[in-house]
Amino acid sequence: MKISDFCFASANDGSYTLKAFSELNEYKDVVKLVSDEKIGVGFHCYNLGLMNIVEDFSGNLDNESYLTSKVGKRMASELVTAYSKFGSTSSRTLHSSLNLPVVNITSLPTSQAKDLKPNHSLDDKGSMLRTQIHSILTGNGPLTIKRRIDAFYYSASSIFTRHMTSKYANPGSNVPQRFSFIPDCAMNKKPTLFLENRDNELQDSMTIMLMLGQVFSDALTYYLNASILYGILGRIESKVQVDLPAITLESVHVTNNLEISPAAFALIASVWLDKAEILSKLNAIDFIVSPEDNEDRISNLLKLMLPVQSNNITVEKSDTRFSVTHSDGFMRYYMCFSKHEFDYGDHLESFGIPVLRVRLGKPISNELNKPMLVMFKKHESISSINVRYQVRGGSIPKFRTSEFRRDIGMLVANSRFMATDITLILSTFYPFTQETDKLFIEQHIKEIFLDMYPWIDKLTSADAKSEVNISYGNLVLYSYGELVKNSIFIAMMDNCKDARNSFSRADMREIQAFVAAFTQ
């Protein structure tokens, strides 16, 4: 999705980011040049919970007493005020030079601050809450594509909790301790995010999504301001007149139009949560956004992806691949960047272990030439074809052993959650009925599916059908038109002999409930 699909830009006085950049040698001189102009910008992810509220009570946004009974006094007041003034100049403050809504932010980066979110100013016209409500209510705003945003956020949080949270439970991790709750949330969360399935058990899931949105917003804000300062430096060196508002708006436009996948969203959040220096993290994000132009920065990104800091790091470089390996004596962590998937495909399959692949950069005609990043964990002791691997857990690691057939190749560590995930994603698109919508939905779901589980295509083409998640993958990729038929779901669940063994009773009930909701 484009950044502008799930984020909106705002203006501020610049103090939020300029203070951090003023402490960096690379930027301190240019910060002095622009600090007097009081111009700064920020990006903010739409709050999914707030979008749900606006959509649920769209017919009562002028009824404060009713809203108070449903969402509380403050939220009701903000909703009614924003709705009553919607479209008027008094509904929000616009920056005189940038014509962007003003949201004053004065805090440290999320990864360094004590709270999970920036300290937004709550003055009457600059309220973050009211500004976001205003943006949500806009005619061509996020509510028009809310189900796409639902699926995008859920996909990103699934990738984050399944593949990037081992570092949070590790005592030696390079991540702030206050985020140690994430693995526990991932272990216990109930995937009941979407409109048809809301209840009081979604708190952990929504907490993770809200946190990821705040962290991503913070990372994007710093990335945007760094690009602005870099643009100013370029003009100074070229002896070109510096027009700060013009440079700022140009950078906002470029950032708004960046295409980003759920995996890249999760990866950026994971990088930003690291306690590394800001400049190091910005370099890593720059590579994620534009890998073709920043190949010299891949080593920085790979090292930030390591679960723990260590001097025991092995770096290997070649013309087509850059890889980093770290061993902590119990697990071996391997990260690899390659220009061509086939350069390391055989190498990965020979391990037969869980893997996450992230496609980076803009889509181009030749799929094999799109840069890819891969991350997987390998147990130090492997005998025969039995592989021990880590699955989701809290502070105490949990393990299980599986046997991998060589013709199946790579399997996901926690595959039993796959069916629930994919059914949830599919169910969010069910209300669309027009043929043109169906074509769009089919392609979008395939993209999300392959972004989360890129190895499924290879498994299904090899007729690997022994696990229920592979059967789902086969249906999603090759039989989407048949997916809406109830008989397909029933046959799939009945024919997958491993389903009862792969899923707990609670999981089976949950899956069957979602299947029933989707096919009714």
Swiss-Prot record:
<protein>
    <recommendedName>
        <fullName>Non-structural protein PNS7</fullName>
    </recommendedName>
</protein>
